[in-house]
Structures are given as C-alpha cells and as structure tokens.
Amino acid sequence: MIKRKLERYLQVLNNIDDPQDKFVWIMDFGKNSRPMSDSLQVREFEVPGCQSQTWLVPHFVEDKIYFTADSVALISKGMVCLIADVYSGSSAQDIREFDQKEFDKMNLNTLLTPGRNNGVHSMLKKVKFYAKKEDNKVAV
C-alpha cells in the first residue's frame, strides 16, 4: 500500500515539467490538507531537524498507524502531509520494512534547499520512529 500511494504521487509530480510548478503543487497539497488541532502542536510530536516547526502525530487504530501532520511553512506542510498520507493506514511492520529511499525518486534534491531536504529526511525518520514504538502506543 505504501509503495502504491508513493507511486501515485510520483506520477503526478513527474507529469509536472517546471520545477517551480512542482514546488507550487507541493505547497497547494499542504494548503488543502486538513489542519491540525493546536493541542497536538507540542514538542512530543515536533519533527527535529526541520527548518520550520513541523509536527507529525501518529494515531494507532488496531494494527494500523494513521498520521496527522502540519507545519508553519507551506513547503514543509506540503511535504509532511504528503509523507503522512503515503504512510497512513499502514501497519508498523510495513512501515519498518519499506525502503525510504523510494522517496528519492521524487528528486526533491533538485527542488528543495539542502536544509529542506534534511527536513524531509527527518520527517521520514520520525515515521520510522513511530513504527518502532507502535507496540508502546506512544501517541493519541
């Protein structure tokens, strides 16, 4: 399921030729994503290593993890919401086993600054962290 969702976004982004238009698409994705409750914008859910405050919250439902995400910067919000959508509804095991290098196919290194690219890697690490903690049910 993770790979299928990611491939859907890759197809959309690969059909956009202009890098600036890709940038706008990612920001629009964030703008159109559901806002996160202010009560969840706490240090526990903050993604370290992002240039802007960014939050990623896991919700454990039966054997699946669903994510809510937000950021104060539109490009970060777009990326974290896209990542949240790709992984939401997956089992912790599927998340742990998925090769996050698949995200490299988005070629974000040509689109984002090095600092923003580091932020994306931090978002992906946070997802893996939650998948490893799944048995402890650390979140809401």
Where are these regions (language model features)?
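Short acidic alpha-helix initiation/capping motifs at coil-to-helix transition points
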Residues: M1-K5, L74-G78
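A general alpha-helix detector
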Residues: R8-Y9, M79-L82
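Short, hydrophobic/amphipathic alpha-helical patches that form generic packing surfaces
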Residues: D28, C81-D85
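Solvent-exposed interaction patches of small proteins and small membrane subunits
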Residues: E44-Q51, S71, Q93-F98
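Amphipathic alpha-helical interface surfaces
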Residues: I75-M79, S91, D99, M123
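Glycine-rich phosphate/pyrophosphate-binding loops
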Residues: G89-M106
